[in-house]
């Protein structure tokens, strides 16, 4: 068993002796009976050197959106009335209703005992004061259009078919818990 973080020079190839995984750097392939890809569908597809038509058709039907997360202490992004603050606070831009933002009030959500309120805001539509920013993180989330939702039922068709197993939040609603749930389900297929 080997656990590896995805690198830019990583690929998986099928061979007569099983799966070969190239980790880059020293031009060396490692041989495995099975490989688990616990990552986004698009990243999993990019890691497979020569995906089957079925793998390509299924994994390419999941889209992802870039997101900006800002960890901060700026209360000005929250509603003026503190009585309506909740763990999850959703905001919509009045001028452009397709723009929305979500702020997690981490003190309530994570039961933090800090003196200061701490927030995690995704894709802010209001400016967050620079001096109150703790960290900025860019990442991607699954984007659920009808194509992705319809395609979720097909994921079982590629599970362990080429000795490659898949898990990730795209098996569910995009939450961390969905990634965990999909890994538990994936393990049931490990010895098929």
Segments from the language model and where they lie:
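Single conserved hydrophobic/aromatic residue that forms the stacking wall/gate
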Residues: 1-12
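Short secondary-structure boundary/capping segments
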Residues: 2, 61-62, 155-157
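Mid-domain catalytic core of redox enzymes
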Residues: 13-142
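Conserved flavin/dinucleotide-binding core of flavoenzymes
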Residues: 99-192
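A short, aliphatic-rich alpha-helical micro-motif
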Residues: 5, 29-30, 159
């Amino acid at each position: 068993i080997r656990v590896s973080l995805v690198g830019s020079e990583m690929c998986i190839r099928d061979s007569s002796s099983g799966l070969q995984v190239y980790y880059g750097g020293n031009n060396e392939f490692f041989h495995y009976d099975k490989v688990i890809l616990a990552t986004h569908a698009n990243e999993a597809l990019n890691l497979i050197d020569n995906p089957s038509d079925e793998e390509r058709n299924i994994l390419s039907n999941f889209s992802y959106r870039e997101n900006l997360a800002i960890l901060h202490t700026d209360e000005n992004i929250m509603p003026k009335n503190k009585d309506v603050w909740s763990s999850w606070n959703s905001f919509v831009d009045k001028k452009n209703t397709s723009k929305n933002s979500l702020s997690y009030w981490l003190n309530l959500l994570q039961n933090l005992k800090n003196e200061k309120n701490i927030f995690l805001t995704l894709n802010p539509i209001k400016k967050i004061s620079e001096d109150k920013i703790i960290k900025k993180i860019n990442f991607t989330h699954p984007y659920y259009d009808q194509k992705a939702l319809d395609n979720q039922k097909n994921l079982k068709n590629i599970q362990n078919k080429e000795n490659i197993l898949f898990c990730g939040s795209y098996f569910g609603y995009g939450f961390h818990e969905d990634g965990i749930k999909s890994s538990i389900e994936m393990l049931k297929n490990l010895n098929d």
